[in-house]
Amino acid sequence: MPPLLKLALELGPLLVFFFANARGEMLIERFPILGSIGAPIFLATALFMAATVIALAISWSMTRTLAIMPLVSGIVVLVFGALTLWLHNDTFIKMKPTIVNTLFGGILLGGLFFGKSLLGYVFDSAFRLDAEGWRKLTLRWGLFFIFLAIVNEIVWRNFSTDTWVSFKVWGIMPITIVFTLLQMPLIQKHSLTDEENTAS
């Protein structure tokens, strides 16, 4: 899959979520039937769920596979989005990033506790590292996911819904990109050469 299309499929649902929340009242004025869903955050949640399903469907149709992280995240979006709409309580969709990041962080750190560097199983086809490299990278990503979960809790519990939505779309992605780039020295240091990879 082309990198730009992959990025669009990852960012698309988030942009739909941001736009629907920011322009929800305008959309409801233009399409009154949408008002039955509720306030802009609930309309945004419904469209976020739809966009997530569409993005996963496009990804599946092109690659005949779904990466584990987008799949898990998509399932949580649908579950917590449905709870948000059913109970008419936006707390559930706000907690979704906390649940997903805690889940990923817990799995990675739990794997290390049992001596397994689980990132190696996920990204081994993308790049090869020695055992120490996978251990360090797994530890860093595990702690980073926990950090994101804590930050999400702080933001949604202490700021307005609009601020939380903006942070979710325009804050988390740049932070994640910067963190990813900061891992490049570690990846380069522990990368295996073709000879080492063949020998291992």
Curated annotation (Swiss-Prot):
Cellular component GO terms, alphabetical: plasma membrane
Main location: membrane
Topology with respect to the bilayer: Multi-pass membrane protein
InterPro entries per the UniProt record, alphabetical: YciB (IPR006008)
Lineage top rank: taxon: Bacteria
Record field: transmembrane: 1-21, 37-57, 66-86, 103-123, 136-156, 167-187
Keywords: Cell inner membrane, Cell membrane, Membrane, Transmembrane, Transmembrane helix
Localization in the cell: Cell inner membrane
HAMAP family in UniProt: YciB
Role summary: Plays a role in cell envelope biogenesis, maintenance of cell envelope integrity and membrane homeostasis.
Family: Belongs to the YciB family.
Name of protein: Inner membrane-spanning protein YciB
The organism of origin for this protein: Brucella melitensis biotype 1 (strain ATCC 23456 / CCUG 17765 / NCTC 10094 / 16M)
